[in-house]
Each structure stands twice: as structure tokens, then as C-alpha cells.
Amino acid sequence: EPIKHWTEKLNVGPFFILEHLDLKDVYYYGKNGEENEIDFSVALAYSGNMQIELIKQHCDTPSIYNEYVNHKKNTLHHLCTFTKNIENDIKILESQGYRNLQGGKTMDEGTFSYLDIDNNLSPILEIAQLSEGALGMFDMIKEASINWDRKKPIMDLGEISI
């Protein structure tokens, strides 16, 4: 349903679905461990230079994603910025009052953290230090959006030819 809204009403697409992302070293409010394994998928698209990320969690593991849904929020969840030194940026943000809510690593050694300053849960700030492979994938998805003909709202990454 959300993809249909973005593609038909807002002319954003195509979306690329990454199913059941594999993360490691996930923490949630400072708690590490196996109990924090989150099963979720994302659908990615671009509108100009802005990446749209639709997240669907498939489990009941506590996370900022289902915490948001449980609070029945219907607004922007988070904004993301990329960094080359995530540890330093986290320290700076925490010194300014931000709380590190959730984070972890991707299988290609990218690192991400979600931070909030006022317990409002909207919008949360995500900072991510990504691998070259992830940045390249995002570039390919962005390029696919430029000449999108609206015929296929959902595409497979293998369909991208640049």
C-alpha cells in the first residue's frame, strides 16, 4: 500500500525491495545481543536527491520501527545523513543531548545509528557510515529513478543497467 501511494500519487519510483536484511551487533537502547535481531525489509526509491526508505518489520522484536508503529505515528520517522566517522559524530551528538536509540552493522561492514533528542520519536536522526558497495547501490537506484517510465513500480536490482 505505501509503495502504491508513493508511485501513483507522488510519482516516486521505481522501488527496489531488499528483503530480510541481515544485520549484526544490533543494539536497542544500549542493549546488545541476540534478542535484538530484527527481521525487516526495506523498499528504496529516490525523488531527486532524496532517498525514500519504506521499512516493514516482520517480527515483534523491540525496535524503533515497531515502537513508532505502536505509538500510531503517521509522520516522518527519520532523516539520514552519511558520514565518514560515525563514532566521532555519535560522541558529538550525545554531548549535545541526543540519545543513541538503536544501531548496528550491515553485513558489508556499514554502520548506522538512530539518535533522538526529545523522546518525541519524530523525526529521529539516523547517521550511517556506508561501504563503497552500498553507496554504489544507492547511486544505481537513484539513476534508475531519473528516467523511470512508471510502467514498473517495483524493480529488481538485477534489472538496473547503467
Which residues make up each language-model segment?
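A short linear hydrophobic-aromatic micro-motif
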Residues: 100-102
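Short Pro/Gly-enriched beta-strand edge/turn motifs at strand-loop
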Residues: 23-30, 96-98
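Short recognition patches in nucleic-acid-associated and regulatory proteins
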Residues: 18-21
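Short acidic/glycine-enriched loop/turn segments that link adjacent beta-strands
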Residues: 107-111
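Glyoxalase I/VOC metalloenzyme domain signal
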Residues: 1-16, 32-41, 46-97, 116-162
